[in-house]
């Protein structure tokens, strides 16, 4: 999977590769560099050690996370296990989210996109959500 240049920068800590894992909030993969990892680690470590919430995050995030290096052309190879977890087929789309990005099955993303755009419009128009 070719990762666009804007996601392979020193600014987000992804100049040499990305960390990829099943997204905690959506049925897709999430990926990013050291900056994204630091944000997740800080959120996990802010919770009391051994708490059910922290353990759930640790099990979901750390256990499923894979560091992936780029080849000479800026591509990564997604592990089959991650693809299965996210229900990815042959046709995927990369959705940029600032310092991170998501990898969606194209059909699932297309079904979600219109609802997300409508919500974004409500937020921008100051409507109660």
Regions found by a protein language model. Give the residues of each.
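Active-site micro-motifs of SAM-dependent methyltransferase domains
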Residues: 9, 84, 111
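Acidic (E/D-rich), amphipathic helical modules within compact regulatory domains
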Residues: 2-46
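Intrinsic, low-complexity N-terminal interaction/targeting segments
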Residues: 43-58, 65
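A short beta-strand-loop micro-motif that forms or neighbors metal/cofactor-
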Residues: 12-29, 87-104, 121
